[in-house]
Amino acid sequence: MAGNLLSGAGRRLWDWVPLACRSFSLGVPRLIGIRLTLPPPKVVDRWNEKRAMFGVYDNIGILGNFEKHPKELIRGPIWLRGWKGNELQRCIRKRKMVGSRMFADDLHNLNKRIRYLYKHFNRHGKFR
């Protein structure tokens, strides 16, 4: 009976203690979660397109006589190029720039999102 209590309750009590700190009275540590062999090395393509193009535009100013700004080389929506901000600012900027050309449902959903974020930012956060 005492052995069962010690193995059940004692194990739960000392389960969080690191292996190096356990005393020998608790028994041999379990080796269930410990890896005994090294995992096989991952095969990684070091010259895929993303890695090959990393840093390709870093010297565009030096080599290109500073004619192009790096933000002009960014691909993506026009309202996001070379700009950063939170979601509310991003939605307001999108509505201002392309709101007149959006479908009615998309514009309605964007306006709903702006209303929700406006309420959220005014009720929660550090600067209320």
Curated annotation (Swiss-Prot):
Main location: mitochondrion
Source organism: Homo sapiens
Entry annotated with the keyword DNA-binding: no
UniProt protein name: Large ribosomal subunit protein mL51
Subcellular location per the Swiss-Prot or TrEMBL entry: Mitochondrion
Keyword line: Mitochondrion, Ribonucleoprotein, Ribosomal protein, Transit peptide
Subunit structure: Component of the mitochondrial large ribosomal subunit (mt-LSU). Mature mammalian 55S mitochondrial ribosomes consist of a small (28S) and a large (39S) subunit. The 28S small subunit contains a 12S ribosomal RNA (12S mt-rRNA) and 30 different proteins. The 39S large subunit contains a 16S rRNA (16S mt-rRNA), a copy of mitochondrial valine transfer RNA (mt-tRNA(Val)), which plays an integral structural role, and 52 different proteins. Interacts with OXA1L.
Organelle transit peptide residues: 1-31
Designated gene of the protein: MRPL51
